[in-house]
Amino acid sequence: MWWRVFGLVGGAAIVALTIGAWIWLPLWLIVAAFLSGRLPGRWRALRLLWLAMLALTLESLVLVSLLGLWIGSGFGLWMRRPFWQWAHYDCMQWYLRNLFREATRVLRLRIVTVGPTPEAFPGDPLLVLSRHAGPGDSFTIVNALMNTYDREPRIVLKNTLMWEPTIGILMHRLPNRFVRPDPRPGQDLRSQVADLARGLDSDDALLIFPEGGNFTPGRRTRAIARLRHLGL
């Protein structure tokens, strides 16, 4: 499929970009130090540079790991077996844990969780409905599900996210669904979500973003109108 080719080419480009970024790091440090003296906040440009370098490096390490997992699973032959599925979830969890740990330390990111504790639903799968609130919120909720609630998420994603190589490769190897905001004739969105919900284990969580984009009053009104048109 086209996403495999794009994932291979895009993944190689990200790894090459990461190597180039590290080679030119002394120059970036000089530029960031210069800008930090002219921007508000304490060493803002240097902190953003560090987080960008970290994100690139983590993504490259994940891509290399995904290649290794593909080879180790018999070039994808055993990819759906429990061990290899767990290995992919572990890779995803490691990436998010390190990214958010550094974001908390470097950017003073603070995430407050309210509601039931992780022990509130022992042995039960979860259905999680989330509202988009801005950049990074999807990563935030997935990180909370994996590293706070110790869940393996099954996610309904917008199909445009397949263009991001790491997301496209990793999400296709795990039980997730990429959907179009305007399904083509013959595409039953409800059936796709229902198929994804079947067979949820005790440590699984089905994550859905019903609005499909950042919240606006107009988008909410249109979503309600679509549901009424469907008789829901």
Outline where the language-model segments fall.
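Membrane-anchoring hydrophobic helices of lipid-metabolizing enzymes
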Residues: 1-126, 140
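Soluble catalytic domains of membrane acyltransferases
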Residues: 89-232
